[in-house]
């Protein structure tokens, strides 16, 4: 048996080690020295011994007074294990590796006790049982119980109670062999478990007192049982301790060191033992020796051992010899010999740790539920959570107090030994040598039993089954008695400890009561109990950290009484002889009764001991909420669970350790598992608010109280009779349950019971299960025992449900009230961690053996599984949670009630799972035991059930896919910067004081800022300039919302090197009362570098740059043209490097394998490399300046440099920037860079024009950096107004009286990037369709000539215009789309929208994305494209599908032209309006031409209306297409374009020209142009182009010039095609079709053609159809354009659409440019004289549609001039200067200057230039920044891929679902397409079907209203038309 037990012990040791330290080996090593002492508590089988040993060690450590002894194993260990809690959590744990923590230090801090306890939990559980008697003896001389809990790491334990306990224990301990053991174990126990020794002593004494041999069989059994329970609890504590960095049990304890010393002494080796060096006097009790042996076998060698192997053969041999001799002695004197036995156990390989655990358990009274001061102090000293400290304290106390109950035997070595022997006898029967087992029984047997029980309880089962049989027979009558008997049994069998660990609050109390009874029964039950309670209180306090741990332990104690009876029957009894069993039963009955009473009193006392009973109550309630409703045990377990989770995780790290010390964790897991089960059955997850446990508790409490009273009465009446009766009840249920458990899994049984009983039943079941488990632990049935040991509570709970519910509840009522209260308080205090100690301890009490078993059995990983079968695991975990309850019927009831209570409250307990930066907090834990055995957190493989809400709540992470987890594991976004707070104001109000941040610098005064900057910059005096600014919160801006400046801060002299703007925070006088908001280094980079950069960047970017569309480029209304109207010269912004992407939520290159950070248009690797070199070099040079001037911000930006170096600019280390934006004459409206790094800054390097590089000289045109919300202070930095006035006089500060700027605005609001993208998509889609249809375009072209004739017929509308429209070929658009031309500019004008998108995308830029989307909008006339002849005839117009204009106008050309041309693309102006707009656009240039074009178009389209105006207007009706074109129209010019379109639009020309020419007199066209021109200010042509689908006409007219200019401008923005708009000039001018074609070719050639593309497609859309007609030469262009994707609808709206696009392009730089370009091209094609000039000019002024004005013929020039005159409005923003509080502080950056500001927090802007020209910019701002979330390696490619996988998976799931539901996913995509391309789609059908056109014709003919015109789906589709409607 000894060998078997030693085997178990070693097995246990690993478990214990695991609990102490994740590194099993390390723990094993540590345990060699530490375990001996511990094994006295554990291995001894009697807790007393272990406790004594521990006590000894503790004293030694305390003697060391926190000085490393240097000789213990931990001290000798040089490197951390890397597996323990402290090593694993090095970042948060400030404690030394558990493996390296000096035993003495641990003892002093009680941490060793933790560690020992953890070890002892498993090892000491059994050993402690035997050692308890020894401890008693030892405690006499030394406080072995808990008085020295402080030394035991349970320092927080209440010292008062400890002292009381010590006294009581001392008084008790002296009795009998306690002295003997005291001499032996006391040295060890006191040194190691000085605190626990005392409690153990009383227990031992009690056991010892009673242990007359007959009684002391029972007493011994009781002691053993209780010791085992205590050991379990202790093991849980130890586990918790190990998890929390408590000394590993394996660390050499003082006992171990004494053994080492003695070994060295006897072997004449160099004594490396502790200075204590009482080698000869070293405790040699069997438990201690066995513990030491187990440790030694696990690699714990004497400190000075020189053996090479992992073990010291000599030492092992010596220990074996000692153990043999000790066993002999133990056999000789079963009780007195217990201490010796513990020594022998240690010697005989009984791990001292186990012995110590047993002793500790004995030393730890069950009553110490509440956390004590020791726990608090421990938490502080150990820097661990209070929960952990409580757990440790509880374990410590349990090891001493609970074992104390067992200590009855343990305290007296012989008696505990006998008890242990009885237990061992029963266990040993299985194991072999009962006597050897007796020493081992408590510890080793307990451990073995745990492992065996879990594994099958082979060794223990054999003896257990007999004992259980006899015991059960005896006990069946009285289940309670049986439980009491199992108390010893629990000590001997780890099953009982499991119950003890499992016991929940009430159960715990019951266990305490039972413990008290046991204590009394052995000797003076009440006295012993009181003594135990004293220590127990301390320990319980400690344990109370985790009510589960302690409660379980306590419950186990009580339940041990109850369950011990059962357990004794099952385990101890089986091992014990019948006499011993009987004795134990009798003793247990009396003892239990007394113990219950004492425990109740003690509990009351304990509750008072709590720091805050209310808080504790709240905590307890919380825990209960958190705890599973099944049993309060579970709550306890859950309390333990939380710590267990951590521990389990850590244990998982070292599975071996997991096996050894996971017991506490598995119990908690078991508890969790049961909780889920209970929750499942009892709505565990119900919201805490919904869970009303009070009623349930009240009922249960009443029942429990009644039951307790009954039990107490029965106990008081008869030790056995009452106990037997209660036990018989409990036993009946518990045994039945046990039997069931034997056959059925504990979980199953428990679940069944719980399901049937509800929460209360569940609780009872848990208790019963725990009880039955306890019995089972003693039972020989392997599975049963295993289940019992793992989930003894579960079985007990089942039994309890059957029989013990009532009695258990009775006890529970009292215990429940008190214990629950305590638990609640504790929970409130510690939350879920509270469960840790309780769970742990209880689980170890009940699962101590299970732990071992767990180590042996994978199921043990599951909280309960280790002891339970897979099924049993679930139920038993509950029981396990409340082993004490399980042991006691009352305990069962209590446990059940507690569980129920806890279950209801359990929701308050939270489960925290974290993966990477994501932490999932759930209120419950539904874990299958399998899951819990692994992590305490279910894993996918461990999912106990199908995915459910409860399952997800239980462990959300387990339901995540690996890709999702990988995403989750990615670092979370950095939290927003937290800046220093102050007490100056109640709450910082940034609205009043301005943004608050300090990373640029701050100080209490302005003078401090000067000092700060002088220190940073290295110069003083005039070199540093401080300017105070005042935050007003009133933004200075023009009436149109554009930036203005009221004060300009300039560099005063060469001496001034650095200028800082500081803000005094209103109402602040703190250290951050003044903050720096801007730093300007006037000489940031060398002058030469600045000069070269200016020229290089200008040349490269102007040619190849790809403008970036930025929202800040426009005012709020998106109608300003602050960047300039000429797409060729307008200001633009170019982005390089890495920047943040909303799509990726990280770097925009996330999916780029080979990102081009300096991407230029086309394939220009050399240019890109050139830019790369320049910017990288500049970033490298700017970074040091940034670091010098703003070190904190710099550091913030380089934090993640190493990780995300791919997203950084710079050639040297120290790369704060990720990207750079080059702003060339770009006016940035007031904005904040919201996506910048939250605690970083932007660094702006300014390069200025040659005329602005001299200090003191103010250039004609300059750009200022403005802070719109600030005003300049009236005083200088020194508070002097005179000084400020002097600065103003010298020019340092320029005070402006006005800020005159030309008011430039777009015809219509520019589209957002999103809109443009959508439009582009639509346009692209339409374009494709049109292209397919346009295969017929040649015919159209032929027809277009006819149309052209018609257009010619209309002198007002030149055919050329139509041709230009034709020229606006989709190909051109496509080319422009390709950015053949200077796409950058045009795209910019389009704001990149047009250009990036298809020509159609250009169209998309326009409101009428369908038309714009299809430059073939003429396709709207698309009918034309389809119908080579202007099928516009269907409008009743001749094939002059100029009729489209008419039909667009729906017959009311006049009305529409006037309305539409005039101003309302949206209104769908009449042809006249359009014509007027066109005329205006063309100005005087070709009013006639425009009309002619209009007339031509109308004729061409429909001869019907010689009054081209109407036709033209109709064309403008077609304009609706342009209106679609309005996507281009989106551009400010959009409306204008519309207006112009009637006159100029090539598309309109075919239709409108005929109409407009006829209906519109040149005057009308002119007026249209004129109206357009005003809008042209932003882009006259664009406007006209936009407004006129027929715009070609208007564009061809004078509008052509101005319109082209505008168009070009927009085109430039939108696309280089705008430049080609200049080509469109020919449009205005009469240009042969060939010429037009050439123009078109030119425009295509230009990148900006993209805008034109839209133009050709947009403008020509109708022309496309009309192309054949192409209104003459324009027809060709139109054909091409139509071939370009011009949707039929677009064609329908052709004239308008085309010119609309064109116009729009100019007006909407980003969106309209293509259109404008097309229009321009069309116009160029048009033989308009102005068109010709325009053509020339357009090519020249391609970027400046407005420049077309200059290039246009006089007529056009005039019209353009008119347009300009109208648009050339200047504003001085007077109102801003009338209010002093309106802000507008500007800084005039110098050449090479570096400006640093927090752009993310401060509103900033740059003023518009009078004449922006990015080709020769007045200022180039190189803005270096770091966007947020650019912290992933390789641009976040891995994250992106993971995301894609996730999306793909989702898509797959959706597909499967769709397939399952029979839904076609295509429908969704189609729907989406319809959404964005609905118009296009609609248009496309018209394009495809002439019928559609006829329908339109009919509509058009029938009605003049836009609505009628748009009766077609096209109208709706063209969205833009809706405007007109």
Swiss-Prot record:
A biological process from GO: positive regulation of gene expression via chromosomal CpG island demethylation
Membrane found in the keyword field: no
Bias type Basic residues, positions: 665-677
Keywords: Chromatin regulator, Chromosome, Coiled coil, Developmental protein, Dioxygenase, DNA-binding, Iron, Metal-binding, Nucleus, Oxidoreductase, Zinc, Zinc-finger
Reaction it catalyzes: a 5-methyl-2'-deoxycytidine in DNA + 2-oxoglutarate + O2 = a 5-hydroxymethyl-2'-deoxycytidine in DNA + succinate + CO2; a 5-hydroxymethyl-2'-deoxycytidine in DNA + 2-oxoglutarate + O2 = a 5-formyl-2'-deoxycytidine in DNA + succinate + CO2 + H2O; a 5-formyl-2'-deoxycytidine in DNA + 2-oxoglutarate + O2 = a 5-carboxyl-2'-deoxycytidine in DNA + succinate + CO2 + H(+)
Keyword check for Oxidoreductase: yes
Polar residues composition-biased segments: 465-476, 841-856, 883-892, 1350-1363, 1502-1513, 1556-1572, 1730-1742
Protein function: Dioxygenase that catalyzes the conversion of the modified genomic base 5-methylcytosine (5mC) into 5-hydroxymethylcytosine (5hmC) and plays a key role in epigenetic chromatin reprogramming during embryonic development. Conversion of 5mC into 5hmC probably constitutes the first step in cytosine demethylation. Selectively binds to the promoter region of target genes and contributes to regulate the expression of numerous developmental genes, including pax6, rax, sox9 and six3. May also contribute to the regulation of target genes in ways that do not require its enzyme activity.
Name under which the protein is recorded: Methylcytosine dioxygenase tet3-A
